Regions:
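Active-site neighborhoods and metal-handling regions in enzymes and metal-associated proteins
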Residues: 1-564
Length: 564
């Protein structure tokens, strides 16, 4: 079927005078979890990041290090798989006329990837012409009260107004829907794993705003936010709006503003390319948001604790990866505040655990055997909070070599958790701490140690992260994941992940755990742990027991007490 679709796509090349066509993973909102997954439809690759290039004779799929194994397993056989950090598209594809949809690319990433090629903008997406995606009806947006988010939308808008004035700008184009959600304190139902409403926004220095979205989505919030109906702009009318606006300087963020919108704006205004200030404002959570996240993680941790006990005590009953992830979902649903997963659960047994972002399906699901190591990475959206946690679980005695690797991953995890932060610490500096024990054994992992996390928004959020290249200063109120790992192709995967936040007492900054879920002790070589690390584990499991013992049955309590 896919090969037939590729043939149909190639038949369109002559009409548009192109040698190839570029298909990214993201949709026009640059969502990580795109509803219309064009990349999967043309390549069968289901990972959350990647770019396909279909040429007249060759097909290429560029992915990052998390997805190399998965891409080889999933993609149709005539795709050449390239790791994008090793070779950019322009290193392989040169002097070609390449077609692209300007709504799906920013000028920055297009130029970086496709130097030495002639890029041809095609407004009518060629994949959409072939697959005919159906538009799904969505529910109206809804508002969050100040008691939930801790700050009114008026206060946030004032901060943006001040930013515009200080940068001698008339307007800011907020192209990222999650930033619109944060600014207006609204949420929606447009995305499968995040309460982000599909909307964009233009705001001027006088605090006037124009919300760009489907008009039927905003009937509720028009009254609640006292927005004039004339300030609601249908997506197709963006050009008319820009022509009516007066002024000179327009700020866009070319990391998130598509070429399509950039081209419309620059016809009339001088473009000022600056980072959207909302990213940094949104990254620092206030006490209301932190407290709601703590409560969400308490509920999530109880589900995880029950799940881990259950799966370690199923008495030789053979289950599949899909069965396990469905069972975890049932435990989460016991909380009335649980809404849905914050991303597709990863439950990888044995060799599947080595696929960093593996997803078990009815076709790929594997039986979990007693000798397997099971990697479970999952998360939830709650009223109100976002969770993400990974545990590596075993069911029988493992080789000493595997225990040693697991313990070195754990030592890196603890090293991050116990970091005493200075004011100029960055994710790059902290990443070194996480990897150092593995690197002593010439081992490493091909992903960052941690990503930022949103408050009842995206589970992956910037600009902060713990990675080799991130130079953003870590500040009070930031939320990050702490997830070092190791993956042996065709054998096993190990990852230990907690969500952490930056806390301040007097002049000291340090990380505090959100996540409360038992860490697998049967994989630890205690001879490799020092007193500080052992004490960390003792206190961590004691905290879990104190929090959940009253909610567990006798057998669960006994098991949990044995971990202390």
């Amino acid at each position: 079927m896919i090969l037939k679709k590729i043939k149909i796509l190639r038949n369109k090349f002559k009409q548009y005078d192109i040698d190839g066509y570029i298909i990214p993973k993201n949709d026009e909102y640059f969502s990580e979890y795109a509803k219309n997954d064009r990349l999967k439809n043309i390549s069968n690759f289901s990972g959350s990041a990647g770019i396909a290039i279909i040429l007249k004779k060759n097909n290429y799929l560029f992915v990052d290090g998390r997805y190399t194994i998965q891409a080889h397993q999933e993609s149709v056989e005539n795709f050449k798989i390239i790791e994008i950090h090793k070779k950019l598209p322009h290193n392989i594809i040169k002097n070609c006329n390449l077609g692209y949809d300007p709504k799906l690319f920013t000028s920055k990433n297009l130029k970086n990837y496709f130097l030495n090629n002639n890029l041809i903008s095609i407004n009518d997406n060629l994949i959409d012409q072939i697959f005919k995606f159906k538009e799904k009806k969505t529910k109206p947006f809804y508002s969050l009260e100040k008691r939930v988010v801790g700050e009114t939308h008026q206060s946030k808008i004032s901060k943006i107004s001040s930013f515009l004035s200080s940068n001698n700008a008339d307007y800011l184009f907020v192209s990222a829907p999650e930033n619109v959600a944060w600014l207006l304190n609204i949420r929606g139902y447009d995305n499968p794993n995040s309460p982000i409403p599909n909307a964009r926004l233009i705001i001027d220095k006088n605090k006037n705003l124009f919300l760009i979205t489907q008009k039927n989505n905003v009937k509720k919030i028009i009254k609640e936010r006292k927005i004039n109906k004339n300030q609601i702009i249908d997506i197709k009318d963006i050009s008319k709006l820009i022509n009516k606006l007066k002024g000179r300087n327009f700020i866009i963020d070319n990391k998130t503003c598509s070429i399509f919108y950039e081209n419309i704006i620059k016809l009339k205004f001088k473009i000022l390319d600056k980072d959207d200030p909302i990213y940094k404002l949104k990254s620092i959570k206030n006490s209301y948001e932190i407290n709601h996240m703590i409560e969400a993680h308490k509920k999530d941790g109880l589900a995880l604790t029950r799940f881990i006990y259950w799966i370690k005590n199923i008495n030789k009953k053979i289950i599949t990866e899909v069965y396990a992830q469905n069972k975890l979902e049932k435990f989460r649903k016991l909380s009335k505040d649980y809404l849905y997963p914050s991303f597709n659960t990863i439950a990888g047994a044995g060799s599947n655990g080595a696929i960093v972002h593996y997803r078990a399906t009815a076709k790929t699901t594997k039986k979990i055997n007693a000798k397997d190591i099971l990697l479970v990475d999952s998360g939830g959206q709650y009223n109100y909070g976002t969770t993400d946690v990974t545990r590596t679980i075993c069911f029988s005695s493992q080789k000493q070599s595997i225990k040693n690797i697991y313990t070195n991953v754990l030592k890196g995890h603890i090293a991050v958790a116990l970091t005493n932060l200075s004011k100029d610490d960055t994710g790059k500096k902290i990443d070194i701490r996480a990897r150092k024990f593995l690197k002593k054994k010439n081992l490493d992992y091909a992903h960052g140690t941690g990503h930022g996390v949103g408050f009842f928004l995206n589970v992956h959020e910037g600009p902060q992260s713990i990675s080799k290249y991130n130079t953003i200063e870590i500040k009070k109120g930031m939320i990050l994941s702490n997830e070092p790992g190791y993956y042996k192709k065709n054998h096993f995967g190990i990852r230990i992940e907690n969500l952490i936040y930056v806390k301040q007492l007097k002049n000291k900054l340090f990380f505090e755990n959100f996540t409360l879920a038992p860490i697998e002790k049967d994989l630890i070589n205690y001879k490799l742990l020092n007193k500080i690390e052992k004490n960390y584990l003792f206190k961590y499991h004691l905290n879990i027991y104190s929090e959940y013992s009253a909610s567990l049955n006798k057998n669960q309590r006994k098991w949990l007490a044995s971990l202390i």
